[in-house]
């Protein structure tokens, strides 16, 4: 028994077990619903989970911190617009469940009473974080120690900090790789309301793996004549015609599942090739560009100042807490 205990203790499982013991006792005595209600989620609890959805691959610490501020800003903005924490967690949980394979998330599920209320508890562990999510009437114990440890630390260091424009929470977009220059909000949305999203240079993105992507589509499946009509100052297509019918560039990009709206069109035999630069919509924070800045010594504050020069970092208190 002593030998088993020493092995259990040295394995690193002892501390997580002790930390979860009160929670397990609460479930045994009062039921799982009571336990989860006693540990309802807060904005800071959501941030590491949102990072699991928003970030792909490995990123430097300062880049993750920058994304943490963006994620937190998104939560507070959505809460301010009337969404509930449960609705946001519902969406995040569903996204995590859909991406658990690529993110190497281990899941253990067990059926429970079907309720519409989504409850949540997150517990800090010595080797990272694990969390219990109730989604669609099922309890899920998820753990992705390597990532959640990094994401949890980024959330803690930047706790309470959000991006604002003139003291107000605004849309703070991000994308994986720009075409070498991020887009201007006014040009994309055709509204001065988004003028705080300025186009900035992100030339390091041109060196990113996957910067250039080709998509081939049978010509028979496309309109006979596709013509790019307008591009914005960053090179992204804003308008094109399909057999004379006008289409919006980003809408076309999403409908065709193209990597980016900075594309050219070329006929190749019986196929049409779309040659795309960058990945994503190109607005706001370039994750690749920010990561390259972080690797060269830039802080998360400097990264955000670069990609959001019109915005400021402010500290907020958790709403309703």
Cite the ranges covered by each PLM segment:
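Conserved, single-site charged/polar hotspot
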Residues: 1-321
């Amino acid at each position: 028994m002593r030998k088993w205990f020493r092995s259990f203790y040295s394995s690193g499982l002892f501390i997580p077990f002790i930390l979860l013991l009160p929670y397990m006792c609460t479930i045994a005595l009062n039921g799982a619903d009571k336990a989860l209600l006693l540990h309802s989620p807060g904005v800071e609890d959501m941030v590491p989970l949102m990072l699991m959805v928003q970030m792909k691959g490995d990123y430097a610490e300062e880049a993750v911190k920058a994304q943490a501020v963006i994620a937190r800003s998104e939560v507070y903005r959505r809460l301010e617009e009337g969404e509930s924490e449960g609705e946001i967690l519902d969406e995040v949980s569903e996204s995590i469940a859909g991406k658990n394979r690529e993110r190497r998330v281990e899941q253990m599920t067990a059926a429970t009473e079907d309720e519409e209320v989504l409850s949540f508890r997150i517990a800090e562990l010595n080797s990272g974080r694990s969390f219990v999510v109730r989604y669609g009437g099922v309890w899920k114990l998820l753990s992705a120690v390597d990532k959640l440890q990094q994401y949890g630390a980024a959330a803690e260091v930047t706790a309470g900090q959000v991006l604002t424009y003139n003291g107000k929470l605004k849309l703070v977009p991000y994308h994986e790789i720009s075409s070498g220059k991020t887009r201007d909000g006014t040009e994309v949305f055709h509204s001065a309301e988004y003028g705080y999203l300025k186009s900035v240079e992100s030339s390091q993105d041109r060196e990113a793996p996957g910067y250039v992507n080709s998509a081939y589509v049978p010509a028979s499946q496309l309109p006979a004549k596709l013509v790019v009509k307008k591009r914005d100052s960053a090179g992204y297509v804003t308008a094109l015609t399909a057999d004379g019918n006008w289409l919006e560039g980003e809408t076309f990009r999403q409908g065709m599942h193209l990597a980016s709206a900075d594309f050219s069109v070329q006929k190749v035999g019986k196929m049409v090739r779309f040659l795309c630069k960058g990945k994503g919509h190109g607005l706001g924070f370039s994750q690749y560009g920010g990561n390259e800045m972080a690797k060269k010594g830039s802080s998360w504050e400097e990264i955000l100042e670069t990609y959001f020069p019109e915005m400021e970092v402010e500290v907020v208190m958790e709403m309703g807490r």
